[in-house]
Regions:
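Bacterial Sec-dependent N-terminal signal peptides
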Residues: 1-29
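Short, ordered, surface-exposed loop/turn motifs in non-cytosolic proteins
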Residues: 29-53, 136-141
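Short, acidic Ser/Thr/Gly-rich low-complexity loop/linker segments typical of extracellular
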Residues: 49-65
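Short Pro-Gly-centered beta-turn/loop motif in secreted/extracellular proteins
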Residues: 60-64, 69-77
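Short strand-edge motifs at loop-to-beta-strand transitions and within beta-strands
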Residues: 66-68, 100-102, 167-175, 184
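Conserved structural position at the C-terminal beta-strand
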Residues: 82-84, 201
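Structured interaction patches on ligand/partner-binding surfaces of diverse proteins
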Residues: 84-109
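Beta-strand-rich modules
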Residues: 175-209, 218
Length: 218
């Protein structure tokens, strides 16, 4: 992570004196936009200092629930740029003065509703995918399950995945004879038999996600 001071030259040796946090909200629904896992598949927040000599941005990952936070920023004006699974680049100007809260607005390619039920070791996910524009095409829908709450389309962030074409329907995981489930049973039991599921949808080449759902298997 790169820090550039907005203060005078002597202040370049000071610690950052501000910070920022907020939520990336759906411009239509005003709900947080669910995002991929923080890491190689994640959404990066780029903070560009304004009216300074800084030549690099301060970069950090947004969280899966659509929030973002960096408590180590210098006080000054920034342009925020977020290249996520949004119809257009999410960007804004913000003045950081101390610990600052600033929400952003963006439009996802699709909005996804999902719910999950469990019967024994069978997980059933009911879902619906609605493109944010009627001209957009949903090419694939994904159902995932994982041992940990970090879930997205990255192979390291899922224990199981199904791909379907329907924009509304049901995806079922029968884990009774699933190799990933049985070989990691100790891990699952140590977490109170909790698993995590999620739906993703590829629309116009970009993947949006549902919220992450926690379930308990028997």
């Amino acid at each position: 992570m790169f820090f550039a001071s907005c203060e005078n030259e002597l202040d370049n040796y000071s610690a950052p004196n501000g910070g920022i946090k907020g939520t990336i909200l759906d411009a239509e629904t005003n709900e947080p936009i669910p995002l991929p896992v923080q890491g190689s598949t994640g959404v990066i927040i780029n903070m560009w200092e304004q009216n300074t000599d800084a030549t690099k941005s301060v970069d950090f990952y947004a969280k899966m629930d659509g929030t973002y936070e960096n408590s180590q920023m210098f006080n000054c004006d920034y342009k925020i740029v977020v290249n996520g699974p949004f119809v257009s680049t999410c960007e804004d100007i913000v003045t950081i003065k101390g610990q600052t809260t600033h929400d952003l607005k963006a439009t996802p390619y699709a909005r996804i509703n999902a719910s999950a039920q469990v019967s024994g070791k069978t997980i059933t996910i009911n879902y619906s995918v609605t493109p944010s524009n009627s001209s957009y095409t949903v090419s694939e829908v994904y159902g995932y399950w994982n041992f940990a709450p970090g879930i997205d389309n990255g192979s390291a962030n899922q224990a199981g995945k199904q791909t379907v074409k329907a924009t509304e329907g049901t995806i079922t995981f029968d884990l009774s004879n699933n190799a990933n489930y049985t070989s990691n049973l100790y891990k699952i039991k140590s977490n109170g038999n909790k698993l995590y599921v999620r739906i993703g949808a590829k629309t116009e080449g970009k993947i949006n996600y549902s919220k992450i759902l926690e379930v308990t298997v028997q």
